[in-house]
Amino acid sequence: MESADSTGKGSTEQSESQRQSQMDRLDREEAFYQFVNNLNDEDYRLMRDNNLLGTPGEITKEELLQRLQQIKEGPPQPSTEETRGDSVSTGEDPAEDSSNGDSIIDWLNSVRQTGNTTRSGQRGNQSWRAVSRTNPNSGDFRFSLEINVNRTSGTASMPSLDQSAEMPGPEDMEVSSQGEAENVPEPETVPESIREPESVDEPVSVAEPVSVAEPVSVAEPESVAEPESVAASVPVPESVPEPESVPEPESVPEPESVPEPESVPEPESVPEPESVPEPESVPEPESVPEPESVPEPESVPEPESVPEPESIAEPESVPVPESVPVATRPAPVEVTVEEAPIQRGQRRARSRSPDQRRTRARTDRSRSPLYQTVDPPIRRAQHSSSQTVDASNTEEAEGSSRTRHHVSSQVHSSSSNETEGSSRTRQHITARQQALGTEGQSQSTVHLSNPESRSSSQTPQTDSPSNAETTGTGQRPPTIVLDLQVRRVRPGDYRQRDSIANRTRSRSQTPNNTVTYESERGGFRRTFSRSERAGVRTYVSTIRIPIRRILNTGLSETTSVAIQTMLRQIMTGFGELSYFMYNDNDADPNNPTAVSPPAAVPGEVQNNPSAEVRAPIAEPAEPVAPVESDEGSNVATSATRREGRNSRGGVTLEESGSLPFLSLAQFFLLNEDDDDQPRGLTKEQIDNLSTRNYGENDALKTCSVCITEYTEGNKLRKLPCSHEYHIHCIDRWLSENSTCPICRRAVLVAGNRESIV
């Protein structure tokens, strides 16, 4: 009973508070209308043009009067803003400004006077950096804002981001893996994991391939054969480094150098994991089967089934079951490598067996984005057939990887992560270890010593694309990049972008596997942009959110809410925002640093929209069809997920709820209309419409916009169609629309209307 009473009291209090807030809002609205009605034309236009009226009910009459006085006297804000800009340039900007939309608007408006400035700050676990570039000739400037979410391991992950961003750049696995090993090493965890991944890559995969119990036998055969296959299969390992560069053939010639005992020793050490892997062998047999039907009967059947689909793979699978001996495998491996290029497409189409899927899941787990990133190059150079397929299509890779396993093991060293077909991985590991041996035995040793690190090490390599997976604890923080372009708007100028009303286009770019939302709007949903001060109109040119990175970091709900709040505060002044939402999978390796560091250069971002979001993730061999989503809520679609799976492995994009940042779209207030017809009138066009004061005949008439009766003192605006409205109501409407709210007739004849397109 007591609980019921308390509940009743609580609900009563809540309803009372709601009632009171509604009453207060109504009072403020009434005061707003009275204030506007009492303004003369000059004062009204002054406040309207400077966006000082705000929204009815959200501001008191006293505040409106204060704003009017300030604008008449000449706002002191410019000086404070300038000082703000100066402090920003000196790096003294207080973090408070970042959370205040007005302060940023003021700053934006003053930047054109102060020149290039940079602001940075930190709020809690969120660090931000704002950079502006001014064109002294035109007065236009571009503004870039980056928000980074730092976690406990955020600092470590940040460097990894930079490296990872660069990592994608190298096309060759060798380059990327080695470079990563070198670059990643800088991050304490990353270096080891990265180095290990390269050499560990195989060892690691070997460890996981351990599931490749078969690989174990394979690994041993390889290690045994490695002496032999080292020449033959080792070449593949070298090819792994080189394969990255795409030269698999070279791997054959270099086998001798690769054969360096390291590959053999590493395989030996790998064998230890192999013993461990044997348990795993059951899960990974799928991929292993092809390489070594002996290790696991299951794997043998799978290989057979998979191989059958893959004509090339079959030969390998045949050798695997029949010629379990490594010797046979080596030859097939080389053959596969040569044939691989041809098989790539085939395998992709083929790899679809349940086993492959298992391998795929497994691959996702152990696979790291870097590897994936590296994989694409490897695919080209190395047994691009199996590994390329694996890298680009984990599914395909998984399916064909088994078949390729032996071949890919060598080539797959780089793509072993993706394939994660344990057998392949081992072979790759062996080969890779051998290749690594040539590169650096220490790395291979590391791999051997830490086979388990394969998952983590692979992740490190993947770090560049999705650090969260790569470093485990050291996940790279999500980055939000906002690109704004501020233009000087002169009287008479009327371009589509300058229109307060806007149109939004939604398009997807298949080649980049990206989801893109593009808006061109010169104003905002509200009648007048809050940033329209002193003749400056601010609009968002692009906003890019790296969905992939966000997903990989696995943000907690609390963190995402905090970021959303911060973004909303920052965006408040920008009204309706247009944004680009790129899937990180389409990351362009050529522009790795744009997204990762909080200090990304705004100019680059502006010029290369995709570069910002671009994470060092390898583009899947077969581009995933871009997915369009409403307000970004459904960005994670099957296609996107497929893409994500290929590049990031463990992370899945299936649940849209797992993309907390996508909900940020609601703050951007996207207009979903796809019509390209111009909408909205300029202030000059609106002012040219006739107006009149309230008359006795208007006593019982009602404004159709606010649904409020006209009262004495009201100012009415009359449209050509003879319909009348409150001046402030219809002005707001016409800023976004060009038709009468009642009859929907065009307010301006097409001939008299300036071209908006």
From Swiss-Prot:
GO terms for molecular function: DNA-binding transcription factor binding; identical protein binding; ubiquitin protein ligase activity; ubiquitin-protein transferase activity; zinc ion binding. Residues 11-21, 202-237, 314-327, 408-424, 453-466 have a biased composition (Low complexity). Pathway: Protein modification; protein ubiquitination. A zinc finger (RING-type) spans 703-744. GO terms for biological process: embryonic axis specification; protein ubiquitination; ubiquitin-dependent protein catabolic process. A motif (PDZ-binding) lies at residues 754-757. Its EC number is 2.3.2.27. Residues 1-10, 110-138, 147-163, 383-392, 428-452, 467-476, 501-517 have a biased composition (Polar residues). Residues 245-313 have a biased composition (Acidic residues). The keyword Membrane does not apply. Residues 197-326 are annotated as: 21 X 6 AA approximate repeats of P-[EV]-S-V-[PA]-[EV]. CDD domains: RING-H2_RNF12. Keywords: Developmental protein, Metal-binding, Nucleus, Repeat, Transferase, Ubl conjugation pathway, Zinc, Zinc-finger. Pfam families: zf-RING_2 (PF13639). GO terms for cellular component: nucleus. SMART domains: RING. It is an enzyme of class 2 (transferase). It catalyses: S-ubiquitinyl-[E2 ubiquitin-conjugating enzyme]-L-cysteine + [acceptor protein]-L-lysine = [E2 ubiquitin-conjugating enzyme]-L-cysteine + N(6)-ubiquitinyl-[acceptor protein]-L-lysine. Residues 1-29, 68-519, 619-652 are annotated as: Disordered. InterPro entries: RING_finger_E3_ligase, Znf_RING, Znf_RING/FYVE/PHD. Forms homodimers through the C-terminal region. The N-terminus interacts with the homeobox of LIM/homeobox factor lhx1/lim1, with lhx3/lim3 and lhx5/lim5, and with the N-terminus of ldb1. Belongs to the RNF12 family. Acts as an E3 ubiquitin-protein ligase specific for ldb1, mediating ubiquitination and proteasome-dependent degradation of excess ldb1 in a RING-dependent manner. Does not degrade ldb1 bound to lhx1/lim1, nor lim1 itself and thus contributes to the establishment of proper ldb1-lhx1/lim1 stoichiometry and the formation of a ldb1-lhx1/lim1 complex. Interferes with Spemann organizer function and suppresses secondary axis formation induced by ldb1 and lhx1/lim1. PANTHER family: E3 UBIQUITIN-PROTEIN LIGASE RLIM, SI:CH211-59O9.10. This is E3 ubiquitin-protein ligase RNF12-B. It comes from Xenopus laevis. The gene is rnf12-b.
